[in-house]
Amino acid sequence: MAKQVRKTGKKKEKKNIPEGIAHIQSTFNNTIITITDPIGNVIAWSSSGMQGFKGSRKSTPFAAQMAAEDCVKKAKEHGLRKVQVYVKGPGSGRESALRSLQAAGLTISLIRDVTPIPHNGCRPPKRRRV
């Protein structure tokens, strides 16, 4: 009979972090929410694809809401109560992710839009003809 092999990997530490930063990156295809401590070390993260949404359903506001709720649930295990929110990107999940962060019981102290704006950088993709 085979012996059970114990994992010798790193165990997740329970940190006590009352204040953090929530980064919401909302693209046309997906929404990624990352919660970090004030220095920038990742506490919890989640995305629409991680919640089981595939293809075009990943870019919906509902998928972003589910991802934000999951991320807050993970972050609250580390004692998170107050966040600053940095929103990046043009996607449809921006507002709903922000609302669900607030509805999940986190205090939002700051909302900042950090979407990168090119000073005439790369050529944009061609217009869609549908």
From Swiss-Prot:
GO biological process, one term: translation
Keyword Hydrolase: no
UniProt cross-references to InterPro entries, sorted A to Z: Ribosomal_uS11, Ribosomal_uS11_bac-type, Ribosomal_uS11_CS, Ribosomal_uS11_sf
A single Gene Ontology CC term: ribonucleoprotein complex
Family (UniProt): Belongs to the universal ribosomal protein uS11 family.
Gene3D superfamilies (UniProt xref): Ribosomal protein S11 (3.30.420.80)
UniProt cross-references to PANTHER family, sorted A to Z: 40S RIBOSOMAL PROTEIN S14/30S RIBOSOMAL PROTEIN S11
Gene Ontology MF terms: rRNA binding; structural constituent of ribosome
Quaternary data: Part of the 30S ribosomal subunit. Interacts with proteins S7 and S18. Binds to IF-3.
Positions in coiled-coil regions: none
UniProt superkingdom: Bacteria
The name this protein goes by in its record: Small ribosomal subunit protein uS11
Primary role: Located on the platform of the 30S subunit, it bridges several disparate RNA helices of the 16S rRNA. Forms part of the Shine-Dalgarno cleft in the 70S ribosome.
